[in-house]
């Protein structure tokens, strides 16, 4: 099994799929031909925006853009960049249209200490060539099922809908994005307004059938991923384990999950 180890300070992204009335729309060859030309190889707009604040995508960072520092960390390829400007409690009103209510509240609650440096946009994402080749070869094959709650005709590839026609397809692009197997240790915290917090230390493993050399993909065509989480701290939660098998079509084969409480 190929593994990618990372150490994260915070993490977490929860997605909720809501059923909607969606219909499969077949891509034309002309649309597929846009991949790698007017669109990036995975379907994003290649050109920059009219305002000039988002640049053209030119391939992303090269594999040797940052030198390895050890312990799975790499040097910052943008270390020399300086902020274009800094948003503070004194000037946030002029940027209000681009700020969330939560960010505005932070400026108002902590006017002396909360600042938001803004850097130029960099389109640094790049994937292996085999990912681009696979996305183009399978474009138009995947189909939404069960009102968008699942997909079919998708055999453990990446970016199921590179030219999405609905919000549900965009969500499935996120769910099927290119990822390596992961073994990571990270911490979660929910700070109170007075600054106090309790750290929850977690260890997680995530495996994808197409990235697991000891798995026969043909025996599990509906499997999206395998997930295992162990709580290491605090003591009252230490030893708790969560195991999940997620599927592409959860009506055909519902999620399987097990919890062990120490």
Regions found by a protein language model. Name each.
Residues 19-21:
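N-terminal signal peptide c-region/cleavage motif recognized by signal peptidases
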């Amino acid at each position: 099994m190929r593994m990618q180890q990372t150490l994260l300070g915070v993490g977490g992204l929860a997605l909720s799929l809501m059923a909607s009335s969606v219909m499969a729309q077949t891509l034309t060859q002309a649309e597929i031909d846009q991949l790698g030309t007017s669109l990036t190889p995975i379907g994003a707009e290649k050109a920059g925006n009219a305002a000039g604040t988002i640049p053209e995508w030119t391939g992303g960072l090269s594999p040797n853009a940052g030198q390895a520092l050890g312990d799975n960390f790499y040097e910052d390829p943008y270390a020399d960049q300086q902020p274009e400007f800094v948003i503070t409690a004194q000037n946030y009103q002029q940027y209000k249209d681009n700020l969330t209510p939560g960010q505005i509240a932070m400026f108002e609650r902590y006017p002396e200490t909360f600042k938001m440096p803004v850097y130029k946009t960099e389109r640094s994402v790049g994937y292996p060539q085999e990912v681009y080749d696979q996305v183009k070869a399978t474009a138009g094959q995947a189909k939404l099922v069960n009102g968008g709650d699942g997909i079919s005709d998708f055999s453990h590839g990446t970016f199921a809908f590179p030219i999405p026609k609905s919000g549900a397809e965009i969500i499935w692009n996120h769910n099927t994005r290119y990822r390596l197997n992961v073994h990571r240790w990270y911490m979660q915290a929910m700070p109170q307004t007075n600054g106090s917090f309790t750290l929850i230390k977690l260890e997680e493993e995530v495996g994808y059938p197409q990235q697991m050399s000891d798995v026969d993909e043909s025996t599990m065509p509906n499997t999206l991923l395998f997930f295992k989480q162990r709580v290491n701290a605090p003591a009252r939660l230490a030893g708790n384990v969560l195991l999940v098998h997620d599927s592409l079509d959860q009506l055909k084969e519902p999620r399987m999950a097990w919890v062990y409480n120490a």
